[in-house]
Every structure is written in structure tokens, then in C-alpha cells.
Design a protein with these regions (language model features):
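Divalent-cation
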Residues: 2-445
């Protein structure tokens, strides 16, 4: 639903009949979903008169995305209830969180999100604001992903069916083992005529059996689907010839050199985990039934700004974070801001492990096999700002746990939060969840 700039029929959404029903049965689902999806601190629905909203935002007219004056961590997004091209009411809400202002400059993403929410709040309105708990749950997630992942608008119902199918595959096994698989949803399959293996008989996602799904691993090979979820064959991605193994990893995963706009990838990554991504690195992942939006540029920029490291180092760190997550390895990576022996010793116990005469380096591909093994071992790996490993394993000193440090559910999270008093600590759980700690802040990736 495109944003309509005109005076709404109702000046305050709260004056609509039964809107309180949404506040009671749909508001929590709506706010919780957006908070988790965008990794935000808070979502607030701005229930006020239109003139009050304009005064608060210091604007003469309402736009889809607006800055909140005097707040460095808030923006206001406006969806709308529109029926038969008649604007009934604006639905404004505030997004609060770190770096949320970035969406003011890349507003196409938030615009598409706002459009998807407009569709859902209008549906809720047409049902007398009943059913908000399911309208703004998993259904909203699938509509938003379908809306935001591509410049082309896809059929939300067919896309939701594709997601449901991939979720089923993510929880199934072939010959007793979980297996990855994937598809490229494409507007024109002739764009992939090189390295394309055509079926004798066209398939549909509902007629493909498990043995056939096993043929495309979602890494090198992908089913090509049209907008009706039909497939005529499998595409084999091109082989990159580059010595930059970190860059190769990201280019391979997002098919940077193969995927054509407005096409996108849907794949299973591991047990109960799916991913929807484009060639730019925009990605929606569902891990443990929670949808999250992420972009590798955002998290690498965060590390660069917090630690003063190079982007090359930040991408190498992210490389190992993602390897642990996708291989379901529980681990902690710690990058101290102050890498002095005194600073590290102050937060760790005496049983620090240093194995080699020369330091391992996360930027060196030949060291990868050893680093992978170390990450799967007990304790936290300590990485310097230059990418060299300072200690293969350390343990957070819980005896000095101050009252200001919140006790967390898992000892690994507690350790990561303690270590993050100096720099950044990343906790990867066995279920694939990634949590990044910096000071008192926790960010999901």
C-alpha cells in the first residue's frame, strides 16, 4: 500500500471504533515483532491528534519516515489505514534504538516495511480490530520479508507458502541427517542460462520430493523458481578466482557476482534456521522461531566505530562469527579495546591459554583450520585489533562480578557481558543465535 499524502478522515487513530481492541490484543505482538526484527530498544505507538504529532516532530506535513528532534536514537514511521483509496487514519509509531537514524538515509527499506504494516493495520481495521494477535505475528513477518527483500513486489500468499515449505525442510532429514537446500526466486530464468541444468519435466515446490531437494544445497546449487514457485531446473553458481578468502566467503554466500536484481535467495541454513537474502547483503534470518533483519555492513561498521579496527579485520571477525553460527558451534570471541596484559588479566582468571610461539592470524587463510578448532573449545578466544590471536582461551573472572552486571540465564552470556566491559564480546549459541555485547549494550545479529 503506497503512502498517501493527504488529510485523513480521522485525525487521531484512537478515535476509530474498537481501536482499543487492537491495543489490547495486537499491540504487544506488533511491538515485540518489530523490536526483535530490527534489533531495537523500544517501539511506541504514538496515539495523538495529528496537529500534536506535527508539533512534536516540528513538521508541516506528515511523511512516511521522519526524524524525532532532540532524540539521537529515535525516528517516527507512519503507516496508514486506507480503504478504496480513502485515507481513514495515520498509524504513527516510534522506532528507538542504536543507529536507527541510518534509516533516514536509506529509507526505501523502512518505506517498504511501513507499506506492509499499512496492509496489515488496514486488514485489522476492516475486521473491527479483531485478530491483531495473529495479523501482527508470523503473518506480518512473511509479508514484510516479501515486501522488503526485492525491488519487485511478490505475491505475499505464494511467498508465505514458500517460506512455510522451507521451514518444513529446515526441520526434516534425509537419510537421518539435516540437509541444507535453497532456491533463487527470479524474474527471468534466462539470466542464469550459464551453468543452468534444465529438468526434463518442470517442477513445483509442492511436487519436489526430498531426494530432489537434496540436489540443491543452497550454497553452490539452487533451484530457480519463478513468481508462481515453479522450477525448470537447477543453477550452479560461478566459481570465484580470488586470493581474498574473507571476501570470497561473503561473495559466495550472497552470490554477489551471480544474483541479478530484483532476484533473491531463500534457503535453509541449518536445523530450524532459514535465510532470505539479496546480492547486496540484506538478509532476513529466522532462528529459533524469531525473525531478524541484518546487513553485514551494519555490524562491521559497528565494530570499526567501537574498536577503531580496520574494515578488513571486522569482516574477518564476522567471518568466524558466521562460521560458528552456521555450524552450530557455541563460542565466545573477545576483542578488547585495551589489549594490554594488565587490562586482560583484570577481567580473566589465571588459567589463560597461549599455545604458539608465533601468533595465529584471523586474516591468514592457512590458519583457519586451527582457529576453527580453538573456537569449538572451552573459554573465550581473545583477538587483537590487528587480527592476531592474543590468547587461544581465557575464562571470565566471575569472582569480581560487580552488582551492576546483570545475571543472565547462561554462564556464557554472563562471561561475554563481563568481558565486554573492555571492548566487544560476541557469544554464539549452539542454536545459531548471535549476541554482541559492548559495555552494557546487547545487540542481536
Amino acid at each position: 500500500m503506497k503512502f498517501k499524502k493527504s488529510e485523513p478522515k480521522i485525525q487521531c487513530i484512537n478515535k476509530l471504533d474498537n481501536f482499543n481492541r487492537f491495543l489490547n490484543t495486537g499491540q504487544k505482538e506488533f511491538c515485540d515483532f518489530l523490536k526483535k526484527l530490527l534489533n531495537l530498544e523500544q517501539i511506541r505507538i504514538q496515539v495523538c491528534e495529528l496537529k500534536e504529532l506535527k508539533k512534536w516532530l516540528n513538521v508541516n506535513r506528515i511523511e512516511e519516515i521522519m526524524d524525532v528532534p532532540g532524540r539521537n536514537d529515535e525516528i517516527c514511521v507512519v503507516s496508514q489505514i486506507k480503504v478504496k483509496d480513502e485515507l481513514i487514519a495515520y498509524f504513527p509509531y516510534v522506532l528507538k534504538g542504536r543507529n536507527v537514524k541510518i534509516y533516514l538515509n536509506i529509507n526505501s527499506f523502512i518505506s517498504k516495511l511501513a507499506e506492509a504494516i499499512s496492509d496489515r493495520i488496514t486488514l485489522c481495521y476492516l475486521q473491527d480490530f479483531k485478530g491483531g494477535d495473529w495479523i501482527f505475528g508470523e503473518n506480518l513477518a512473511r509479508i514484510i520479508v516479501a515486501n522488503c527483500i526485492s525491488t519487485k513486489k511478490y505475491d505475499g500468499i505464494k511467498f508465505a507458502h514458500l517460506i512455510e515449505k522451507m521451514e518444513q525442510l529446515a526441520s526434516s532429514t534425509f537419510e537421518g541427517e539435516f540437509f541444507p537446500t535453497g532456491v533463487i526466486v527470479c524474474s527471468d530464468s534466462t539470466k542464469y542460462k550459464n551453468n543452468y541444468f534444465e529438468f526434463l519435466t518442470p517442477r513445483n515446490i509442492d511436487t519436489l520430493d526430498k531426494r530432489e531437494w537434496f540436489l540443491a544445497n543452497g550454497r553452490e546449487t539452487f533451484f530457480l523458481l519463478d513468481s508462481n514457485t515453479n522450477s525448470n531446473g537447477i543453477y550452479r553458481k560461478s566459481i570465484l578466482n580470488t586470493s581474498d578468502y574473507i571476501g570470497r566467503f561473503f561473495d559466495d554466500y550472497y552470490l554477489t557476482n551471480d544474483l541479478k536484481t530484483p532476484d533473491f535467495i531463500v534457503r535453509t541454513v541449518g536445523p530450524n534456521e532459514i535465510s532470505v537474502s539479496d546480492s547486496d547483503g540484506k538478509e532476513f534470518v529466522k532462528v529459533e522461531n524469531v525473525w531478524r533483519y541484518r546487513h553485514h555492513k551494519n555490524i562491521t561498521r559497528f565494530m570499526v566505530e567501537q574498536l577503531g579496527i580496520s574494515y578488513k579485520t571486522s569482516y574477518a571477525i564476522l567471518f568466524y562469527i558466521l562460521r560458528c553460527s552456521r555450524n552450530h558451534i557455541s563460542s565466545i570471541l573477545w576483542i578488547p579495546d585495551d589489549c594490554s596484559e594488565k587490562a586482560i588479566n583484570s577481567l580473566t582468571t589465571n588459567n589463560r591459554v597461549k599455545i604458539w610461539n608465533s601468533d595465529l592470524d584471523i586474516m591468514n587463510e592457512s590458519h583457519q583450520v586451527l582457529i576453527d578448532k580453538i573456537l569449538a573449545s572451552d573459554g573465550a578466544i581473545v583477538i587483537g585489533k590487528n587480527g592476531k590471536i592474543i590468547f587461544e582461551s581465557v575464562f571470565a573472572d566471575m569472582s569480581n562480578n560487580s552488582s551492576s552486571v546483570v545475571k543472565l540465564a547462561e554462564s556464557g552470556e554472563t562471561a561475554a557481558k563481563l568481558l565486554a566491559q573492555n571492548g566487544i564480546a560476541i557469544k554464539i549459541s549452539q542454536d545459531g543465535t548471535i549476541k554482541i555485547f559492548s559495555g552494557n549494550e546487547k545487540i542481536y545479529y
